[in-house]
């Protein structure tokens, strides 16, 4: 992990989990959340907002911030879906996509993404190649009935 999250939200995530949700996403883009861009690569901040806009506009995905990998997954989600992703944080988007298609309960809580005071993002532009198939999966394959 990049050690770049507000871990104070873990108790709130767990509370949502105890209410029956299978995935609880920390969202920087929902009301009460905050996405500090000052030390993030400019292209990354544009991509985060673009992907979120597209998925919100064309799907019923229950998170406004699908690119944030800070999530709580239920044991059922982890056991049901073998992880195929081999690079970086792609597994978080993969599990979200598969759970969405299988009608697992997904919710989000607001989270602030603090300004990075040390280190740098592990985001690589080449990672987009690995994220893209899962975003397309969400767009192309609606939840099963």
Mark where each language-model region is:
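Hydrophobic residues within well-ordered alpha-helices
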Residues: 17, 99-100
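Acceptor/aglycone-binding surface of glycosyltransferases and processive sugar-polymer synthases
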Residues: 7-89, 115-126, 130-135
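The conserved acidic donor/metal-binding loop of glycosyltransferases
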Residues: 1-4
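A charged, well-structured terminal subsegment
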Residues: 143-144
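Acidic donor-binding loop at a coil-to-helix junction in glycosyltransferase catalytic cores
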Residues: 89-95
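Catalytic beta-strand/loop signature of glycosyltransferases that borders the donor
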Residues: 63-65, 103-113
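Residues at the C-termini of beta-strands that transition into short coil/loop
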Residues: 27, 99, 110
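Phosphate/oxyanion-binding loops and surfaces in catalytic or ligand/nucleic-acid-binding neighborhoods
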Residues: 57, 102, 139
């Amino acid at each position: 992990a990049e050690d770049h999250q507000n871990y104070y939200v873990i108790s709130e995530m767990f509370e949502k989990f105890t209410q029956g949700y299978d995935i609880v996403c920390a969202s920087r883009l929902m009301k009460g959340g905050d996405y500090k861009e000052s030390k993030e690569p400019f292209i990354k901040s544009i991509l985060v907002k673009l992907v979120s806009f597209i998925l919100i506009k064309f799907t019923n995905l229950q998170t406004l911030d699908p690119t944030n990998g800070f999530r709580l997954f239920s044991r059922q989600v982890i056991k049901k879906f073998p992880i195929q992703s081999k690079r970086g944080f792609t597994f978080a988007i993969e599990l979200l996509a598969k759970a969405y298609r299988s009608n697992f309960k997904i919710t989000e809580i607001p989270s602030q993404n603090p300004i990075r005071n040390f280190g740098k993002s592990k985001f690589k532009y080449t990672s987009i190649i690995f994220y893209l198939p899962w975003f397309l999966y969400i767009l192309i394959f609606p939840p099963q009935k």
